[in-house]
UniProtKB/Swiss-Prot annotation:
Zinc finger map (unnamed): 3-34
Name by which UniProt lists this protein: Transcriptional repressor NrdR
Cofactor note: Binds 1 zinc ion.
Organism of derivation: Desulfatibacillum aliphaticivorans
InterPro entries in the record: ATP-cone_dom, NrdR-like_N, RNR_NrdR-like
Gene transcribed to yield this protein: nrdR
Cofactor: Zn(2+)
GO molecular function: ATP binding; DNA binding; zinc ion binding
GO biological process: negative regulation of DNA-templated transcription
Entries under PANTHER family matching the protein: TRANSCRIPTIONAL REPRESSOR NRDR
Family membership: Belongs to the NrdR family.
Keywords: ATP-binding, DNA-binding, Metal-binding, Nucleotide-binding, Repressor, Transcription, Transcription regulation, Zinc, Zinc-finger
Purpose: Negatively regulates transcription of bacterial ribonucleotide reductase nrd genes and operons by binding to NrdR-boxes.
Keyword Methyltransferase: no
ATP-cone domain residues: 49-139
Amino acid sequence: MKCPYCGETEDKVIDSRQGKEADVIRRRRECLSCSRRFTTYEKVEDMPLVIIKKDGRREVFNGEKVRAGMLRACEKRNISVHVIDEFIEQLERDLRETGEKEVPSHQVGEAIMNKLHELDDVAYVRFASVYREFKHVNDFISELKYLLKQQQKGGK
């Protein structure tokens, strides 16, 4: 580490402790050249989570974009924003825990679809109509038939 006083790079660590944030380490150092002390902070570099879109474009995961889509689907439904926000936080954690730096968008979309299916069928169909790019009324009918079949099986 370069000494802020004399510019030398040789130093020794006198003290290390966890910073106020759990992902930061605070180190007290002493320059071996001028004997002055200084503090440094180490933090793990955040690796951006990249989503691979259908057309091959890559985009950094944006929880706000997911939130906006889910809120649109859940509009005028009895689903709290808190539930949506918790889901998005968990989704991002789950995606990061895979260890993959890049995740296909369909993996994110399907996770959202599964959560909405669990929460509210109307919100699910609304989201599905955009996510699956429904073009005709028959697309809605097919999805509704699927939901009815799931309900008859005892899925909901």
